[in-house]
Amino acid sequence: MAPNIRKSHPLLKMINNSLIDLPAPSNISAWWNFGSLLAVCLATQIITGLLLAMHYTADTSLAFSSVAHTCRNVQYGWLIRNLHANGASFFFICIFLHIGRGLYYGSYLYKETWNTGVVLLLTLMATAFVGYVLPWGQMSFWGATVITNLFSAIPYIGQTLVEWAWGGFSVDNPTLTRFFALHFLLPFVIAGITIIHLTFLHESGSNNPLGISSNSDKIPFHPYYSLKDILGLTLMFIPFLTLALFSPNLLGDPENFTPANPLVTPPHIKPEWYFLFAYAILRSIPNKLGGVLALAASVLILLLIPFLHKSKQRTMTFRPLSQILFWLLVANLLILTWIGSQPVEHPFIIIGQMASFSYFSILLILFPAIGTLENKMLNH
């Protein structure tokens, strides 16, 4: 019998082993859909981004008007821009849910997969940040100024580092051109790290909601999960297109309709919604270096999660106390997101400080403590 080209061709067999004949657990729920949704988000962002880059000019005197030109004069330019801007929001919604799934079901015990995932998150955050600067509106400019300025808190080399990043003594034309270069490059870096992420995942196979070995009960990825992924994709695209077509500026900042002006500071400088939780943690510490360290820790703490797992059970499916703690953490992150969008005044300052303290306490102290307690409860 002639060999099946799907299984023998050097390139096709890689695709086959990853997307067609991949043995998958029979019981993974819709929470396992977000990986494929993230891949589609990345593809969408790269395609819309390439189309936008064809009409964009990375120069301080032309950037703002080139974006306006794209929206007004390019065929479907308004649509491409709205898809790209809101695609970023959906990218972050998917990645937050994907990380939440990993936390809840103990997927972080696949350490290499988890760590490459954290690197992907950091790269995505960097990409979104430099991309937000490109339209060169007021919030683009001042957001870039505030966040890049944080590096000046690094002792001894800080100020030099910031001026090196800026390419001058303030955010100006050299900053914009290098941010465009980085924003063009990083999505392809993300695509590369995604391949590594999947390579590590396929070493072990997927986890499942029970957190037990599923080797005795595997099903082929296609048609079961390929179809399930298409359903998930459809369900994501409905709200995505609704947002991009009916309310494209809902999540944006009105300040960005004003061209960047170094002489006028906006009353409230704040990032896009997906960075607000980290921004709230940054602002909750009155010291500059302390705030920067807390900001870094708010994301890098994910790298510690595998070492803080003390439970004998992998997932939280049968651990009600840990479940309560998990949803407290989710509520806490929503509070931080809200605080990040508020002005720095009473009572928001103290709420932000309490929420920041709770965030680190839950992850570093309460999760391991409750895990240990649940182990003891199992013995009685």
Curated annotation (Swiss-Prot):
Q: Which GO terms describe its biological process?
A: mitochondrial electron transport, ubiquinol to cytochrome c
Task: State its cofactor.
Answer: heme b
Kindly name one Pfam family recorded for this protein.
Cytochrom_B_C
PROSITE patterns in alphabetical order: CYTB_CTER, CYTB_NTER
Among InterPro entries, the record links this protein to: Cyt_b/b6_C, Cyt_b/b6_C_sf, Cyt_b/b6_N, Cytb/b6-like_sf, Cytochrome_b, Cytochrome_b_C_euk/bac, Cytochrome_b_N_euk/bac, Di-haem_cyt_TM
Residues that bind heme b b566: 98, 197
What other comment is given for this protein? Heme 1 (or BL or b562) is low-potential and absorbs at about 562 nm, and heme 2 (or BH or b566) is high-potential and absorbs at about 566 nm.
Whom does it interact with, and what assembly results? The cytochrome bc1 complex contains 11 subunits: 3 respiratory subunits (MT-CYB, CYC1 and UQCRFS1), 2 core proteins (UQCRC1 and UQCRC2) and 6 low-molecular weight proteins (UQCRH/QCR6, UQCRB/QCR7, UQCRQ/QCR8, UQCR10/QCR9, UQCR11/QCR10 and a cleavage product of UQCRFS1). This cytochrome bc1 complex then forms a dimer.
Instruction: Give the UniProt family note.
Output: Belongs to the cytochrome b family.
Its function, per the record, reads: Component of the ubiquinol-cytochrome c reductase complex (complex III or cytochrome b-c1 complex) that is part of the mitochondrial respiratory chain. The b-c1 complex mediates electron transfer from ubiquinol to cytochrome c. Contributes to the generation of a proton gradient across the mitochondrial membrane that is then used for ATP synthesis.
Protein name per the record: Cytochrome b
> What is the organism of origin for this protein?
Pavo muticus
Write the gene name.
MT-CYB
